[in-house]
Amino acid sequence: MKFMGANELREKYLSFFESKDHLRLQSFPLVPKNDKSLLLINAGMAPLKPYFTGLEEPPKRRITTCQKCIRTGDIENVGKTSRHGTFFEMLGNFSFGDYFKSEIIPWAWEFITETLGIPKDKLYVTIYLNDDEAYDIWTSKTDVDPSRIFRLGKDDNFWEIGVGPCGPCTEIHFDRGEGKVETVEEFLEASDADRIVEFWNLVFTQFDKDEEGNYNELAQKNIDTGMGLERIATIMQGVDNIFEIDTVKNILNKACELTNAKYGEDKDKDVSLRIITDHGKSVTFLICDGVQPSNEGRGYVLRRLLRRAARHGRLLGVKGIFLNEMVDAVVENYGEAYPELKEKADYIKKIIKLEEERFNETIDSGMDILMSYISEMEEKNEKVLSGAKAFKLYDTYGFPLELTQEILEEKGLELDIENFNKEMKEQRERARNARGESSYMGSEESPVNKVDASIVTEFDGYVNLELNSKVIVLGNNEEFKAELKEGEEGFLLTDKTPFYAEMGGQVGDRGNITSETGMAIVTDCKKNVGGKFVHYIKVIEGSLKEGQEVKLSVDASRRSNICKNHTATHMLHEALKEILGDHVNQSGSYVDEERLRFDFTHFAALTEEELEKVELLVNEKIMTVSVVDTKEMSLDEARNSGATCLFDEKYAEKVRVVSVGDFSKELCGGTHVANSGEIGLFKIVSESGVAAGIRRIEAVTGISALKFMELKNNMLKEAASMLKCNEKDIAKRIAAQAHELKEKDKEIAELKAKLVQGAEDDILKDKVEINGVELVTAELKDVDGNSLRDLADKVRNKLNNGIVVLASDNGGKVNLVAMATKNSLANGVHCGKVIKEVAAVVGGGGGGRPDMAQAGGKNPENIAKALEKAKEVVELLVK
């Protein structure tokens, strides 16, 4: 066989099916759109589900893709074996009610034997036990040797998940060994031994399984195929595993270069190198597709992969930041197929660098605590770390659970995962209660998401805010209805509408619907899972009925304010690019009638000067009264025109481009003002960080901007009145008062110091001796932490061989400090252990070194008991 690189294989596959009249689609982003069942795209057909289910019309009945995928179900095995990986590409060709078995089977054989040139005596085919149709096609429409076709049962060659669409499949296998297998038993044995490997699965979706277990023929039969690019690359390159194929090996070589390690010389180092290679590739693609490191959902998947790779870099001796440099190797090997990698390379590197820096801080502090836990376990001969301690590491110090487990495993220890999960569940419940979460009408089981796929609503609301239409569907959260009466809430679909449905960060319209029989207010307009325009309504008079003519009226004033904020968002995006640089890209947005919120990629808080420049530029462009123009064009035309596209969006072939004069040009389906002058005024309200490398600006426009400035002005007037000065002198007056307060604080500190001066002699009068070690304890009043430490240090200096423990009730809070002479440590004295027990008595916590420790508490009434506890602990330590 001729050697073929992974990039060549990808192109050959897609070109082959283009020659069979398939539409080639670019890979969908790794972040699923409108699919709550998936965290990340994990299969080639996953983003095409709406086409298979009939919820959406495919752009063509024949489609081919190379879909990037992430699977983390067996992440613990990645690196430990050379077979597992988190990132992979799935080649696929799909038919939505077009061709079926008689076409795909000979095409598949043609591709692998003629295009790829795989020898026929190296191939085997499996079919479902009873699929005679597939057998007949294989034997009549291809020249496969019938003795190389094996029939297998449901577990191997039938695809189904519960009830719903399902069907048999045929799989194509490659034989890495010599000689022919003659029987099914020999075939299965060779497969289990990895001599024979499956590399292409053709699924024939021809049945609909009902609740009773009956298989009914589907009127529209579909084809869904999947071939792992990495798997076929191992075959075409004659290698045993994914880390040896050309593209992945190049990235592995980069990992070796950055860590100064050689692959193939040490098993443990090989594990670390494979983890860095695989995870480095995955995090590059995840960040490119808009995922940000976080502690939830897909953001946590990213953080986990990145931190696991960073730790294995440390195991290989890397001291500083290095993972961001892996990006270049990924871009070099995948950039032609995925040009967005090239465009976002600098941004990806910066996000990785920020996260790795943060992790290095986390791991340094967390590792010390974990190692102290492990030391305690070893002292007590314990083998299981408590779930509460692991949760504290995770929740308080940001130390990853998986890292805790991995380190414990390396030391032959275990984690009480059950109690960790219990702690996590309780925390989430507290957070949920704090947020006051509630479900929104329209779960996936609701009738609103079961509307007939053939129903189409024409949106005619860019210009028209009022039109007549016909009710085609009525319902509530429980069922479809023929009529909704006064006081009832539900949903309504019409054949056309002026109501904008929430999308692209813009909220849905509100307004009212009237008919001959009644009136309803529209509280919201959204799209259901099938993309249908759904009006959420409350009937306030009479009733609305299915099939009747209605008049739909959008709240014009509210829409106008939304338009101002949406157009201003586009202008803000462009202004940020001009002031900060081209690395700025939209990461999220929200637009309603009161304000706008814009999240964007940037690596530091904006300075006051930068914010002023951005705000001024937007207002200057508003005052040009530029025409806001909208045009429909092909996606390629839009890109060539310089229109801004969002990386995590999947666009149709025809797109809508919104231009604000010659200043801003973006792909957008939202509603906008007719000219920039309608916005009136733009005012930034706040700028903040929302995640690593993501900033957020909130702003207001028009009347809301004027009201905001009026509020600010009133606040200035009130402040000037309270400070008894002119508005222009407020800053000077505050600075002067701050200086006065600082001087007063200094005086207070000096007075407190005088109060405790010489107190050490009084404190030493209560000294006791325990087994040759001196113990001094004392309770003080209104002494702050700094003064308490100074006093303890002075007392310690007057001891020959001993420990001092001081406690102070400082405004209802307890300050504790313990200090010991160095020679007392040899007698068993340990301040950290003493202070830990003492702090518990006053409802606090703390710790420290053997020679010095401090803590706080909240129950000053227990100070006397706490100091008694100090004596008990010292007696135990110096026996």
From Swiss-Prot:
It is found in: Cytoplasm. GO terms for molecular function: alanine-tRNA ligase activity; aminoacyl-tRNA deacylase activity; ATP binding; catalytic activity, acting on a protein; transferase activity; tRNA binding; zinc ion binding. Keywords: Aminoacyl-tRNA synthetase, ATP-binding, Cytoplasm, Ligase, Metal-binding, Nucleotide-binding, Protein biosynthesis, RNA-binding, tRNA-binding, Zinc. Its main location: cytoplasm. Binds 1 zinc ion per subunit. SMART domains: tRNA_SAD. InterPro entries: aa-tRNA-synth_II/BPL/LPL, Ala-tRNA-lgiase_IIc, Ala-tRNA-ligase_IIc_anticod-bd, Ala-tRNA-synth_IIc_core, Ala-tRNA-synth_IIc_N, Ala-tRNA_ligase, Ala_tRNA_ligase_euk/bac, DHHA1_dom. It catalyses: tRNA(Ala) + L-alanine + ATP = L-alanyl-tRNA(Ala) + AMP + diphosphate. Its cofactor is Zn(2+). Its EC number is 6.1.1.7. One of its GO terms (cellular component) is cytosol. GO terms for biological process: alanyl-tRNA aminoacylation. It comes from the Bacteria. Zn(2+) binds at residues 566, 570, 668, 672. It holds the Pfam family tRNA_SAD. Coiled coil: none annotated. Signal peptide: none annotated. Catalyzes the attachment of alanine to tRNA(Ala) in a two-step reaction: alanine is first activated by ATP to form Ala-AMP and then transferred to the acceptor end of tRNA(Ala). Also edits incorrectly charged Ser-tRNA(Ala) and Gly-tRNA(Ala) via its editing domain. HAMAP family: Ala_tRNA_synth_B. Belongs to the class-II aminoacyl-tRNA synthetase family. Consists of three domains; the N-terminal catalytic domain, the editing domain and the C-terminal C-Ala domain. The editing domain removes incorrectly charged amino acids, while the C-Ala domain, along with tRNA(Ala), serves as a bridge to cooperatively bring together the editing and aminoacylation centers thus stimulating deacylation of misacylated tRNAs. This is Alanine--tRNA ligase. It comes from Clostridium perfringens (strain SM101 / Type A).
